[in-house]
């Protein structure tokens, strides 16, 4: 009888240990998250955090909670508080970098605090072993651009070019540098930036390059090349409507210029 009781006690102990295993709890929390049971997911992640405070699983749990608040429940203050708790308690962890990226996105896209977003990107770049360093540098440059600090943005973007950025990110860097040159009215330099992206495999980048090229030639009053740039857009129903509309507008503008009427050229009409 004593042996039976002892075996039963051992089994109960093992089961209790399994049920409270942090990895198991994190899996259960993830399942609740996928099911849309967000409060249950938060409760389970909090359980892991409270049991594993200071450990790697605790950091994962806090990041999960912050993401649920931010991405699903849209409780931005709770998300910010949770991410800040994570970066305070888990400095140097992989989760700190992820939390700071989310904080930067909230400040940039939700709160409109560009200064704080840039500060978060700076802190990320100070972390050792950042995997997506060039992407973070580009996001920081975009924040400088949105803030109107074009020289800072240009400096950061040129640094990326010097590092030898490639692929889709290279296209984005060239487009953004070209936008800055447009704003600075350095149109010849802007042209070379947009021409680099004309044959990009990215449909959206290619489209933006054609539109910005058209704008730049228009600013130089070279309407023939502006029309050629817009005509060379990829064939699609959406683009065809844009092509027809822009050609009509360019022809009208050319007539106005030739007649001595010089309406102000709108800047940055295409994102």
Model-derived regions: residue spans:
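Acidic, polar-rich low-complexity tracts and alpha-helical solenoid repeat scaffolds
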Residues: 2-7, 14-271
């Amino acid at each position: 009888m004593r042996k039976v009781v002892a075996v039963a006690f051992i089994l109960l102990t093992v089961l209790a240990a399994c049920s409270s295993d942090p990895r198991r709890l994190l899996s259960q929390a993830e399942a609740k998250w996928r099911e849309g049971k967000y409060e249950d997911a938060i409760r389970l992640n909090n359980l892991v955090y409270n049991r594993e405070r200071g450990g790697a699983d605790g950091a994962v749990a806090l990041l999960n909670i912050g993401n649920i608040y931010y991405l699903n429940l849209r409780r931005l203050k709770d998300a910010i508080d949770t991410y800040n708790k994570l970066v305070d308690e888990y400095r140097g962890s992989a989760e700190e970098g992820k939390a700071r990226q989310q904080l930067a996105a909230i400040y940039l896209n939700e709160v409109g605090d560009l200064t704080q977003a840039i500060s978060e990107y700076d802190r990320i770049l100070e972390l050792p072993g950042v995997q997506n360093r060039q992407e973070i540098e580009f996001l920081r440059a975009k924040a400088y651009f949105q803030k109107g600090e074009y020289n800072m943005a240009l400096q950061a973007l040129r640094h990326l070019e010097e590092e030898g950025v490639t692929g889709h990110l290279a296209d984005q860097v060239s487009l953004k540098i070209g936008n800055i040159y447009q704003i600075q009215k350095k149109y010849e330099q802007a042209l070379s930036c947009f021409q680099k992206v004309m044959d990009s495999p990215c449909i959206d980048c290619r489209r933006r390059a054609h539109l910005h090229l058209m704008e730049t030639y228009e600013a130089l009053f070279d309407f023939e090349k502006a029309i050629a740039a817009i005509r060379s857009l990829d064939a699609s129903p959406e683009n065809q409507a844009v092509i027809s509309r822009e050609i009509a507008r360019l022809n009208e503008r050319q007539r106005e210029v030739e007649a001595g009427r010089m309406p102000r050229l709108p800047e940055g009409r295409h994102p």
